[in-house]
């Protein structure tokens, strides 16, 4: 099955053809997660909902480094496709497979061993702490399978194939939902049932991804008899992926700090914020889809030396992400009470969820500015600068806000203001960095190796 030709012809329809299945994959995954949370909220209780929801920033903190490396793998293989270097593509695919396995087992060890200390340090409400720890430990037992799917999808997306990862995710998501209903409604399990169903679904997605890659054409075929780590390709992946991953980790640290402050408002605030966060994920996945398009399209065209196409890709991804994300932001924010009641019948959580959706979700489209700009720079092999700027503009500001502003200007609604403020600051800095780099590059790529 061929992917999208990123080097020739009109770009808009090809970017949409690439991005929409990618967005559908993430949205579908979040939809299944939302079903899990809705089942927990309605049939187990608001404390269980808070236990599952409070783990979101912790999971992000632990997996973001490796997700960044998968982004580096995508960029490296895409660049090699642009350079038509099939030998190095084959070495890169083998390297990605090994990195996926190592990453998965490392995450299992980290997640299971650090669950209690991290959640305790976050001031997780005592009534939900044990449930949150149990959920997190079971969830991370499935990390090796999750990483196999993530890195396998990165290989396919580097050549423009975003449809088959969607099909795999659909099958695994259906299995996840059915198992979740079975464990919670039939076997009367709590958060552990949701976590077990997720791990089983991850195992299914890993099996399907490996089966697919084993049947790919050379140089993208996964060959178990020739698995090895190519030092050159690994270093290139790490050069792009580690700064992006560290950015994501620091980003998650700032979210953990904000979550810790949310926890001080009580279980209802945690549950309401967690319910609202689901809709932020839906909108963010739209941005992520165009991020993926920007990295793959720009990396291939940069590798081929087509700088004018690089510029066109950037603007198409930027404008499209703002339009699609902004539309979803508006729909969710305007009908926030209705959407929040999908996740819980408790009226006590609604005011907190509405506040978050009006002050955070409604302005999420601003984040497109730095997300697309950073992805464009990473597609051209420049990952450190956008990572540093994002750390300063987003993460540092959020921590200063929590520790310096909130004590003298308390309130849940004032805490939420830190999100749009940090997006504006980071957007200005990262867009400026992209413009400066492109002026320096002119019409010739800089140091493509």
Please provide the spans of the model-predicted regions.
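Residue-level signal for short hydrophobic patches within transmembrane helices
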Residues: 8, 12-31, 35, 58-65, ...
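Short runs within selected transmembrane alpha-helices of multi-pass transporters and secretion channels
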Residues: 70, 139-157, 168-176, 194-209, ...
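Helix-terminus/linker motif at the lipid-water interface of multi-pass membrane proteins
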Residues: 31-50, 119-126, 182-189, 249-276, ...
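Small-residue-rich hydrophobic transmembrane alpha-helices
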Residues: 49-109, 146-165, 259, 272-336, ...
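Transmembrane helical elements of multi-pass membrane transporters/channels
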Residues: 17-36, 138, 172, 201-205, ...
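Small-residue hotspots at the loop-to-helix junctions and early N-terminal turns
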Residues: 46-57, 132, 136, 195, ...
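Alpha-helical transmembrane segments of multipass membrane proteins
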Residues: 34-37, 109, 117, 151-155, ...
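Short alpha-helical transmembrane segments in multi-pass integral membrane proteins
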Residues: 1-19, 77-142, 175, 186-242, ...
